[in-house]
Amino acid sequence: MLSESLTKSKLTDPLILDLLQNIREHRSMLEDLKSIKIDPKLTNIISKEIGRELYIENEFHKAKGFRKLHIEVAEFSKNLKILHCVFFPDPKFDIPIFGMDLVKINDIVSAAIVDLSPASQNQGLKYEKLLSEVDKSSFTSLREIPKWGGIFSNNVFFASLKRKSEKNDFCRVVDQYLTILIKLSKRAKPEVNEEIIQERIDFQKNYCVQQMKNEKTSMVLLKYFDEKWVNNYIKTVLFDF
């Protein structure tokens, strides 16, 4: 067992538990999976102050083809729940960036997004057709991609989930995107050309820079922490490079 169960008894939301289990199962298929040690103060963050209850727990791993596999589960003031996951590829390997976020306010899923984002020029040609074949016809409330969302693939999925059937279908879409990612990672061979590696590094840097333009992330955290802490958390834990 590489790590203890996230959130243990604190996490009871069935949708987040289902997604978490699915992500972990796919993560376990990767070769040379190892945990990454980071500052414990950034791994488990808990506040029991009444009205400002907070629970954040992070998992960090690496594997062959991936420099960082990050899962974050968070609950704010008992009504806002977030599941965030990004698998950053090792730039030596031609693998896309897997990203998934779920935002749940009480029982309403206001945002559910999943993508395999390109990590090199024309990389999407390898998998866009596979993503387009994933059935997404059942969703009724698709959302508009934000202005900074040029980092995403043509088949990024972004929606609000209204019905239980849509929540189940989102789990299926995530599962299928992860399955495609694992297949791509197993086919990928290490690159030796420094220019190609640098291009992939630049793509990941841009991915992180654009993600940091999502003001909603900092707005939530600033209700509980000062600006210095929030900036460090975003740049160190969420979108480092």
From Swiss-Prot:
Keywords: Oxidoreductase
One biological process term in Gene Ontology: phytochromobilin biosynthetic process
InterPro entries to which the protein is assigned, alphabetical: Ferredoxin-dep_bilin_Rdtase, Ferredoxin_bilin_OxRdtase
Catalytic activity entry: (2R,3Z)-phycocyanobilin + 4 oxidized [2Fe-2S]-[ferredoxin] = biliverdin IXalpha + 4 reduced [2Fe-2S]-[ferredoxin] + 4 H(+)
GO molecular-function term, one example from the UniProt record: phycocyanobilin:ferredoxin oxidoreductase activity
Cystine residue pairs: none
Keyword field contains Oxidoreductase: yes
Family annotation (Pfam families): Fe_bilin_red
EC number: 1.3.7.5
Family classification: Belongs to the HY2 family.
Job of this protein: Catalyzes the four-electron reduction of biliverdin IX-alpha (2-electron reduction at both the A and D rings); the reaction proceeds via an isolatable 2-electron intermediate, 181,182-dihydrobiliverdin.
PANTHER family named among the record's database cross-references: PHYTOCHROMOBILIN:FERREDOXIN OXIDOREDUCTASE, CHLOROPLASTIC
Protein name as annotated: Phycocyanobilin:ferredoxin oxidoreductase
Organism: Prochlorococcus marinus (strain AS9601)
Underlying gene: pcyA
